[in-house]
């Protein structure tokens, strides 16, 4: 299973990369907005420059999302994003226009990530259009009392049934249990906030054991 980090923070990406477990990065307009919330002069050129900096840190897929809704505009913007770096994956929302853009990109060698996926039919359409990745948002489904992980299971089953090569990225991960469940149902990737990545390494019994080991080690003479 691959681990992506879901952030636009360069510091968080660097910290996660130092752990030796990072395979890629996903960003979106909301994550970008968090890091520039105090900036009044942030331009689209600044956005592209920031994405380029991310690509310099991680040797793996970096998802950068289009910020338009019409297919033609998505295509123009996506081609511009793809030109930033060979590892760029263009994120397109799973809409009718998004599907048109995904099909265009897949036909022209540009990798895509179908995002904002909330149903198995959306995921099936993404695979048929040639998306390289599909991102079901489990946390947001859980928020409305619907099983996000059941959606992931359905997508994995459908893709396995028909041999689709589209990789499933479990998105909107809120806690370590989401990561465990993603691995259990066979998702290819979980994209995880840095705060949750750190939680994956923690356990109270590990802390308790270390405390005891250090106490015992203290009695040894230099």
Curated annotation (Swiss-Prot):
It catalyses: D-sedoheptulose 7-phosphate + D-glyceraldehyde 3-phosphate = D-erythrose 4-phosphate + beta-D-fructose 6-phosphate. GO terms for molecular function: aldehyde-lyase activity; transaldolase activity. GO terms for cellular component: cytoplasm. Gene3D superfamilies: Aldolase class I. Its EC number is 2.2.1.2. It is found in: Cytoplasm. The active site is at 91 (schiff-base intermediate with substrate). The keyword Cytoplasm applies. SUPFAM superfamilies: Aldolase (SSF51569). One of its GO terms (biological process) is carbohydrate metabolic process. PROSITE patterns: TRANSALDOLASE_1. Pathway: Carbohydrate degradation; pentose phosphate pathway; D-glyceraldehyde 3-phosphate and beta-D-fructose 6-phosphate from D-ribose 5-phosphate and D-xylulose 5-phosphate (non-oxidative stage): step 2/3. Keywords: Cytoplasm, Pentose shunt, Schiff base, Transferase. It holds the Pfam family TAL_FSA. InterPro entries: Aldolase_TIM, TAL/FSA, Transaldolase_3B, Transaldolase_3B/F6P_aldolase, Transaldolase_AS, TSA/FSA_arc/bac. NCBIfam families: fsa_talC_mipB. Transaldolase is important for the balance of metabolites in the pentose-phosphate pathway. HAMAP family: Transaldolase_3b. Belongs to the transaldolase family. Type 3B subfamily. This is Probable transaldolase. It comes from Chlorobaculum tepidum (strain ATCC 49652 / DSM 12025 / NBRC 103806 / TLS) (Chlorobium tepidum).
């Amino acid at each position: 299973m691959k681990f992506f980090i879901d952030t636009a923070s360069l510091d968080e990406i660097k910290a996660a990369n130092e752990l030796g477990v990072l395979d890629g990065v996903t960003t979106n307009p909301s994550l970008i907005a968090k890091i520039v919330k105090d900036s009044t002069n942030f331009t689209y050129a600044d956005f592209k420059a920031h994405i380029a900096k991310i690509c310099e840190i991680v040797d793996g897929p970096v998802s950068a999302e289009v910020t338009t809704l019409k297919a033609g505009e998505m295509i123009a913007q996506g081609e511009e994003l793809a030109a930033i770096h060979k590892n760029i994956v263009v994120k397109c929302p799973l809409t009718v226009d998004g599907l048109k853009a995904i099909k265009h990109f897949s036909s022209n060698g540009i990798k895509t990530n179908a995002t904002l996926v909330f149903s198995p039919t959306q995921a099936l359409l993404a695979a048929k259009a040639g998306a390289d990745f599909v991102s079901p948002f489990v946390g947001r489904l859980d928020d409305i009392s619907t099983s996000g992980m059941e959606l992931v299971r359905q997508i994995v089953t459908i893709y396995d049934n028909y041999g689709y090569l589209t990789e499933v990225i479990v998105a909107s991960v809120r806690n370590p249990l989401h990561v465990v469940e993603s691995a259990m149902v066979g998702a290819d990737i979980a994209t995880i906030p840095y705060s949750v990545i750190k939680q994956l390494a923690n356990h109270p019994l590990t802390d308790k054991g270390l405390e005891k080991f250090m106490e015992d080690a203290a009695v040894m003479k230099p």
